[in-house]
Each structure stands twice: as C-alpha cells, then as structure tokens.
Regions:
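An N-terminal assembly and electron-transfer interface module characteristic of large anaerobic redox
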Residues: 1-199
C-alpha cells in the first residue's frame, strides 16, 4: 500500500475512512512517543529490563485502544500520551552520561530494526544512547518543503496553504505530548518545524 500526497500510485480495494485515518494518526503519535521515551530511558535504567517492561505494558494498552473499530476518544488519547511520558520519566535512572548517537537516513532503514541491522541495540550495547527523530518530523518536513516549492519552484499557493494547515494540525495533534515532555525531568520537547528550518 502506498500513501502519498501526489497520487503516484492507486490502491484498489483500499479505502481511507475517517476512522482509519484517525486510528493511523494516533498510532503514529504513540509510536513517536514510545520511541522518544524508550530510547532515552533504556540506556540508563537502574533495573535491567524495566524500560522494556514498561513499554510492553503501555504497548498493549495502546493496541487495545487504537485497535478499536470505533471513532476514538481524543480526550483519552491525550491522557494516554501524557501518562506514558510520566511513567517513563519516573522510571529509576542512573546519573551517568553516555554519548548520544543520531540515527538518520531513509525512512524504512531508520525505523525498521531488521532493515538497519538492529543499530539501536548495537549502539546501546556499546554504551551509547540512540537518538532517532520522530516520524512526524519527517511528515512535517515534507509539508514545510511545500513553502519552498511554492516560493521558488512554481508550486501553487493553494498547495502551500494546504500543507501549512497540515503542519498546524500535526502540531495540535502532538501538543499534549510536547507539553508533557517539556515538564519532564529527562526528556526534551519536540521542536517546531519552523525552528530547524531556519538553520
């Protein structure tokens, strides 16, 4: 299945419904939150295996929530995002400092352990902390790039407006997670796409 904004491929028999879109967006944000929390905490856990155990506990709850066929409660989604971050933030951690290593590259290779030879596990076994950008950040980059295309490469002003609306939507969707990350002891909040774009 290919989902893209420019209609490169059609998917006969596959229909995007409002419910499916909502479930997919919530799953996306839960995945980003899990990745950000787990990779930050696991290298410093005082009790070996505690970060993975907490991840498994919350993963089951998230699957039960997102796996529901109905339209989901946005209030419950927001509450779950905040509670996941709080639980990871309160996991006992050591005070040691480890080198932080960024994992970047093509989307599939970056996010699928089997495609990157389990690079995060390797980095952690070698005494490092892996840092993987959120998948939402990639989507925001794609949307923000439309500004450049409209300003310099002949893309339409309408496409620019639509993509800027999408940016505001994604930022709204992860607002609760960002606010909770900002209040935490161990995490950094997600950046707004406009900030790295200025660099």
């Amino acid at each position: 299945i290919s989902i893209n904004m420019v209609g490169l491929e059609k998917n006969p028999g596959f229909k995007l419904t409002p419910s499916l879109i909502q479930h997919g967006l919530y799953a996306l944000e839960f995945g980003d939150t899990f990745m950000r929390c787990l990779y930050r905490v696991r290298p410093y856990e005082k009790v070996p295996g505690s970060a993975n155990a907490l991840h498994e506990k919350w993963k089951k709850r998230v699957i039960d929530f997102v796996g529901n066929t109905k339209i989901l409660s946005h209030r419950k989604y927001r509450k779950m995002c905040r509670q996941i971050i709080r639980d990871f933030d309160n996991l006992p951690m050591t005070d040691e400092k480890k080198p932080r290593v960024g994992v970047v590259g093509e989307i599939l290779v970056k996010f699928l352990p089997a495609a990157n030879n389990y690079i995060v596990d390797l980095l952690e076994s070698e005494g490092a902390e892996a840092v993987v950008p959120d998948l939402t950040d990639f989507l925001l980059y794609c949307c923000y790039n439309q500004n450049f295309k409209a300003d310099y490469l002949g893309a339409t002003a309408k496409s620019k407006r639509i993509n800027n609306m999408l940016i505001r939507f994604f930022e709204w969707l992860r607002k609760d997670a960002r606010d909770e990350l900002a209040k935490s002891k161990h995490f950094e909040p997600t950046a707004y796409i406009q900030d790295p774009a200025k660099i």
